[in-house]
């Protein structure tokens, strides 16, 4: 009798649960949003006179745009490094989560994926808090400026990463209460 109970337990732990699948979708969305945020040309805009991304800063002088690299400023390099580091960890977590679907014993991958996602969230939050603080401190614009969709995509990626981490932390033994 004990052997049949342990056999049932083994079958139950190898079934893919919907929350883990939703968690994997959250990780994929976070990865897509991170790619969009890093490649976005619009992190800060100012009345069609100024654009700032993670890679370049462009100012409009009369009818001509003058662009400079932002990789000369230490805070912009730090922001880029934090976001790329977080995106790399999210990519690894996604690959581990995807591989865990293909492997029979999935439960051993849940905790590492959750830990990686929480680490990525910490890195990205640090970068996303650093960016506006240092921008306001160092860049003086005489016109109205706003943080644009690239910055918003990065926050979206961070939120989806956090959601995926929470879903991967949920204990699969308690799922029968929900179904």
Curated annotation (Swiss-Prot):
Keyword Transmembrane helix included in the entry's annotation: yes
Membrane-spanning parts: 21-41, 81-101, 113-133, 150-170
GO cellular component: adherens junction; membrane
Subcellular location: Membrane; Cell junction, Adherens junction
Membrane topology classification: Multi-pass membrane protein
Keywords of the record: Cell junction, Membrane, Transmembrane, Transmembrane helix
Major location (coarse): membrane
Xref: InterPro entries: P53_induced
Function, as annotated: Regulates cell junction organization in epithelial cells. May play a role in the transition from adherens junction to tight junction assembly.
Annotated family: Belongs to the TMEM47 family.
PANTHER family listed in its UniProt record: P53-INDUCED PROTEIN RELATED, TRANSMEMBRANE PROTEIN 47
The protein, known as: Transmembrane protein 47
Organism: Xenopus tropicalis
Name of the gene this protein is made from: tmem47
């Amino acid at each position: 009798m004990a052997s049949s109970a342990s056999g049932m337990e083994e079958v139950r732990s190898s079934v893919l649960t919907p929350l883990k699948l939703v968690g994997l979708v959250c990780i994929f969305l976070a990865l897509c949003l991170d790619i969009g945020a890093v490649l976005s040309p619009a992190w800060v805009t100012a009345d069609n006179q100024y654009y700032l991304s993670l890679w370049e800063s462009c100012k409009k002088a009369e009818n001509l745009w003058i662009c400079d690299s932002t990789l000369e400023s230490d805070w912009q390099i730090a922001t880029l490094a934090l976001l790329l580091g977080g995106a790399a960890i999210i990519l690894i977590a996604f690959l581990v989560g995807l591989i865990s679907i293909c492997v029979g014993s999935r439960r051993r991958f849940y905790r590492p994926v959750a830990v990686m996602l929480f680490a990525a969230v910490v890195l990205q939050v640090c970068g996303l808090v650093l960016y506006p603080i240092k921008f306001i401190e160092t860049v003086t614009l005489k016109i109205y400026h706003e943080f644009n969709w690239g910055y918003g995509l990065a926050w979206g990626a961070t939120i989806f990463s956090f959601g995926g981490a929470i879903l991967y932390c949920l204990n699969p033994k308690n799922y029968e209460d929900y179904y």
